Amino acid sequence: MNPQVSNIIIMLVMMQLSRRIDMEDPTIIMYIRILYCSSIGISWIIYQMARKRIVAKNDMTTMKYVEPGNAMSGEGEKLQVTTVRDYDLKEIDSAIKSIYTGMAMMGFMHLYLKYTNPLFMQSISPVKSALEHNEVKIHLFGKPATGDLKRPFKAPSLFGGMGQTGPKTDKKSIEEAERAGNAGVKAE
């Protein structure tokens, strides 16, 4: 099933469950906090296990790709030269940072604004996201890096595939970027 569709289904189910729970009861609020914190902890452990496997594997295969430019800032496409290990670590570190960002937002909404419902709604999402992350699929579940799991990963489009949203890996695009002087320096 498509991850976006399953996210919507899970959110609808969680909304129905949250209507049946007394969000004013301090005992239930404590259980919701424990559920959310354990969910965050489990997802953090999953990402750390994947990170450990990436470092242990130490795949120094060089990869080149053309990163799409940012239309908002007017930047053009840029050639990126990196290793599989560095790319994977960058992806995992980005996922870990997203956990911290989500915790900050939930902390603000729950502790400062006194909302408990979003805390309950987000109690499943971090673990689901961690288990669906491409790096986790490759390094923890042992799936081959082909098809959708081929590096560099394409970002999922909000509008279901209208326009290209991922980096270009074809030889022509890489050669054009090298000739245009948009080459990046290999990070070591």
Swiss-Prot record:
Q: Which terms in the GO cellular component ontology are assigned?
A: endoplasmic reticulum; endoplasmic reticulum membrane; membrane; mitochondrion
| Highest taxon of source | Eukaryota
Q: Where in the cell is it found?
A: Endoplasmic reticulum membrane; Mitochondrion
Parts of the chain that traverse the membrane: 27-47
Task: Check the record and name the InterPro entries matching this protein.
Answer: SND3_fun
GO BP terms in the entry: phosphate ion transport; protein maturation; protein targeting to ER; protein transport
Specify where the region named Disordered lies, as residue ranges: 157-188
Alphabetized, the UniProt keywords read: Endoplasmic reticulum, Membrane, Mitochondrion, Phosphate transport, Phosphoprotein, Protein transport, Transmembrane, Transmembrane helix, Transport
Is Protein transport tagged as a keyword? yes
* Record membrane topology: Single-pass membrane protein
Where is there biased composition of kind Basic and acidic residues? Answer: 168-179
Post-translational modification Phosphoserine, affected residues: S157
Q: Pfam families attached here?
A: Pho88
What job does the chain carry out?
Functions in the SND pathway, a SRP (signal recognition particle) and GET (guided entry of tail-anchored proteins) independent pathway for targeting a broad range of substrate proteins to the endoplasmic reticulum. SND functions in parallel to GET in targeting proteins with downstream hydrophobic motifs. Involved in inorganic phosphate uptake. Also involved in telomere length regulation and maintenance.
- Describe the protein's quaternary organization and the partners it interacts with: Interacts with ENV10/SND2. ENV10/SND2 and PHO88/SND3 form a complex with the translocon in the endoplasmic reticulum membrane.
* Miscellaneous information on this protein: Present with 61800 molecules/cell in log phase SD medium.
Name of the molecule in the record: SRP-independent targeting protein 3
> From which organism does this entry originate?
Saccharomyces cerevisiae (strain ATCC 204508 / S288c)
Gene name linked to the record: PHO88
